[in-house]
Amino acid sequence: MSKKYYFIGIKGTGMGPLAQILHDQGNEVLGSDIDTYTYTQAPLEAAGIKILTFDARNIDANQDAIFVRGNAFNNDQIEVARALEIGVTMVSYPEAVQEQISQTTSIAVAGAHGKTSTTGLLAHVLKNIAPTSYLIGDGTGRGVPNSQFFVVEADEYRRHFKDYAPDYAILTNIDFDHPDYYTGIEDVTSAFADFANNVKKAIFAWGDDEHLRSLKPSADVYYYGVNPERDDFVATNIHKSTQGSHFDVVFRGKDLGEFAVPLFGQHGILNALAVIAVSYMEEVDLDLIRQYLLTYQGVKRRFSEKQIADITVIDDYAHHPTEITATLDAARQKYPNKKIIAIFQPHTFSRVIAYKDEFASSLEAADQVYLANIFGSAREQAGTITSKDLGSEISKFGGIIEENDMSLLMPYENAVMVFMGAGDIEKYEFAYEKLLGQLRTDLT
């Protein structure tokens, strides 16, 4: 029997995909959000899902719906406040997700870094082999009736993943992030320990992460990595090229054969190894895993590429030093003979304060670095540090860019321009691409 759902904050990177899933299942779905365009709304519009502007009257007009409340909203948000006032049925986003994943064999992917890419890769492989629903943090979701698998990205921010109880979990790493909420690495590790204790069947964890190794869940734990002395699933005979990476996989002494992925950087190999591991333990055919790893084309805003004349533009969500290192490493592998230019928009003042030295160190891997002004958040509009302060710590710092002035970036030819950030870095990228396209057209 179909139901009606109303999403408060439907453009959220998790809310949007969940709305798509419920719509795909034949439910009536609508929701509200800000008017500003976001990349997550395109699939909602394509599905014909109605998007309203936040207004308390929306709650009154849809009292017959189940309201799904986005994680970003407090009780004083205009629609949340009205929903609480009149007593309609309202559930949190994690509660709504858990309701969905409880109906099938569920695999949650969690980690400070790499969870979206790994979720996307796992969803791609499984959906081509068996009926699979998935919810990815790039704004992509798909609901398949009578799914065999449900793949979900599990976010550690504010312990949102504590409500999930999946059959399996992939844990890519534990790192100190979100300093506006977590007090330190011990606090983050505690959150992951609580999540791991909810997993029913097995956990697949990166073996080089000592924080992950410190977890003691009741479920079986399989470690993946490149260390045959410590890991259960091991990638060996690794070869990296400008076309991607290929490697052999060994599970506790058993040779599972060679695999190849069109991915770049060491993190791409580890993500693929995690996908191979969980799929193998669910007895998915190895040849099918091999086949569909090769056809993976990535997820939104994770090393997304486009070519404009002689310039390669890469768009990536990297907003933590570890992620910046991984993204620039991938760019070096794929384009070893080109200049790598980093254009980075720091995300939140608290994160820049906490990681100023680490940001500077990670960005040094580029040939030249440009910064946009710090992007604040709804909870953090100002701070005591600036992008210029960060730039002063970077030896290859080229200056601060503005949306209406791309002159610093225009002299580069036959280069790789890597735009990174979790805020609105895309507006700088679009401004650059527009001007670059005009200039290159004028020269032809």
From Swiss-Prot:
Pathway: Cell wall biogenesis; peptidoglycan biosynthesis. It catalyses: UDP-N-acetyl-alpha-D-muramate + L-alanine + ATP = UDP-N-acetyl-alpha-D-muramoyl-L-alanine + ADP + phosphate + H(+). One of its GO terms (cellular component) is cytoplasm. It comes from the Bacteria. Its main location: cytoplasm. Pfam families: Mur_ligase (PF01225), Mur_ligase_C (PF02875), Mur_ligase_M (PF08245). One of its GO terms (molecular function) is UDP-N-acetylmuramate-L-alanine ligase activity. The keyword Cell cycle applies. ATP binds at G111, A112, H113, G114, K115, T116, S117. It is an enzyme of class 6 (ligase). GO terms for biological process: cell division; cell wall organization; peptidoglycan biosynthetic process; regulation of cell shape. It is found in: Cytoplasm. Keywords: ATP-binding, Cell cycle, Cell division, Cell shape, Cell wall biogenesis/degradation, Cytoplasm, Ligase, Nucleotide-binding, Peptidoglycan synthesis. Its EC number is 6.3.2.8. Cell wall formation. HAMAP family: MurC. Belongs to the MurCDEF family. NCBIfam families: murC. This is UDP-N-acetylmuramate--L-alanine ligase. It comes from Leuconostoc mesenteroides subsp. mesenteroides (strain ATCC 8293 / DSM 20343 / BCRC 11652 / CCM 1803 / JCM 6124 / NCDO 523 / NBRC 100496 / NCIMB 8023 / NCTC 12954 / NRRL B-1118 / 37Y).
